[in-house]
Amino acid sequence: MTEQSIKKVSVVIPVYNEQQSLPELMRRTDAACAQLALDYEILLVDDGSSDDSAAMLVAAAEAPDSHIVAVLLNRNYGQHSAIMAGFSHVSGDLVITLDADLQNPPEEIPRLVETAQQGYDVVGTVRQNRQDSGFRKIASRAINHLIQRATGKAMGDYGCMLRAYRRHIVDAMLNCHERSTFIPILANTFARQATEIPVLHAEREFGDSKYSLMSLINLMYDLITCLTTTPLRLLSVIGSVIALMGFAFSLLLIALRLFLGAEWAGDGVFMLFAVLFIFIGAQFVGMGLLGEYIGRIYNDVRARPRYFIQRVVSRDADSTKDKKS
């Protein structure tokens, strides 16, 4: 691997109702970046917060000698869309993403930069000694396993957003216009060299997780339908197997009636209903998956923007011009 120079680092952090953690987040992130001996910027993207997060970001961005850029979206679009909005305004050679809840310490940023300087396109992270609930750990393992099976890329922790991307990887992602985007996976599809490093994981000190059970279920559907068309192929296989089982069962009922009498076939009427319900259930599952794919095709065909930037504030300029993508 040839070492590629990094002259400027951009840190992109999506923010949604994080007013309690913002002062500590900005202080620690700025201190970590100051250790790099490189030029840097910190882009905080307000994802339609209903608290005072947006006002706090604007005040921080307007402060003298501030490295903070506030990107304000007009409403809530979701974590990954907010990050993509931040990507559209970065100017660094290396772009680092970080969650605003401080569970992944900003102090890990210099290690990501050091690893990226070895020539890697993408530097992922694996959370050590995770401070999440048992349910979150189980759900995370299931999602990671699903992604690894679907993509064939054995990255250990896709759920950790503390990651570093070379600028050409970010530019490649910005050229993708699908509505459902999962950034770590999308980045890996363009990466020639990718690696992972272990990072610390802390308990959440402020507020609650923005991922509810329903959010995790929606994320699972997003992953299934934006990663691969394997479920569609699997439906064909399952449908064929069920059809063969139904045909074989019909032959069995005919044989029982011919050789053992009508009572043998008649006594199994409730079994027939049970099998019928199984088949109907399988059809509804298949129709649901097909509906997910068709719905995503519909959204892509409409070509509506993934986000709408209402305002960008920095020490150099304050732009109120709307930008969509």
Swiss-Prot record:
Location in the cell: Cell inner membrane
GO BP field: 4-amino-4-deoxy-alpha-L-arabinopyranosyl undecaprenyl phosphate biosynthetic process; lipid A biosynthetic process; lipopolysaccharide biosynthetic process; response to antibiotic
A GO molecular-function annotation: phosphotransferase activity, for other substituted phosphate groups
A Pfam cross-reference name: Glycos_transf_2
A Gene Ontology cellular-component term: plasma membrane
Metabolic or biological pathway, per its Swiss-Prot or TrEMBL entry: Glycolipid biosynthesis; 4-amino-4-deoxy-alpha-L-arabinose undecaprenyl phosphate biosynthesis; 4-amino-4-deoxy-alpha-L-arabinose undecaprenyl phosphate from UDP-4-deoxy-4-formamido-beta-L-arabinose and undecaprenyl phosphate: step 1/2; Bacterial outer membrane biogenesis; lipopolysaccharide biosynthesis
Coiled-coil region(s): none
Signal peptide: none
Spans through the membrane: 234-254, 269-289
Domain of life: Bacteria
InterPro entries, per database record: ArnC_tfrase (IPR022857), Glyco_trans_2-like (IPR001173), Glycosyltransferase_2 (IPR050256), Nucleotide-diphossugar_trans (IPR029044)
Enzyme Commission (EC) number: 2.4.2.53
Membrane topology: Multi-pass membrane protein
Keyword list, A-Z: Antibiotic resistance, Cell inner membrane, Cell membrane, Glycosyltransferase, Lipid A biosynthesis, Lipid biosynthesis, Lipid metabolism, Lipopolysaccharide biosynthesis, Membrane, Transferase, Transmembrane, Transmembrane helix
Top EC category: transferase
Main location: membrane
Swiss-Prot/TrEMBL catalytic activity: UDP-4-deoxy-4-formamido-beta-L-arabinose + di-trans,octa-cis-undecaprenyl phosphate = 4-deoxy-4-formamido-alpha-L-arabinopyranosyl di-trans,octa-cis-undecaprenyl phosphate + UDP
Classification via PANTHER family: UNDECAPRENYL-PHOSPHATE 4-DEOXY-4-FORMAMIDO-L-ARABINOSE TRANSFERASE (PTHR48090:SF3), UNDECAPRENYL-PHOSPHATE 4-DEOXY-4-FORMAMIDO-L-ARABINOSE TRANSFERASE-RELATED (PTHR48090)
HAMAP family, per database record: ArnC_transfer (MF_01164)
Job of this protein: Catalyzes the transfer of 4-deoxy-4-formamido-L-arabinose from UDP to undecaprenyl phosphate. The modified arabinose is attached to lipid A and is required for resistance to polymyxin and cationic antimicrobial peptides.
Similarity comment: family membership: Belongs to the glycosyltransferase 2 family.
NCBIfam families: PRK10714.1
Name of the protein in question: Undecaprenyl-phosphate 4-deoxy-4-formamido-L-arabinose transferase
Lineage: Bacteria, Pseudomonadati, Pseudomonadota, Gammaproteobacteria, Enterobacterales
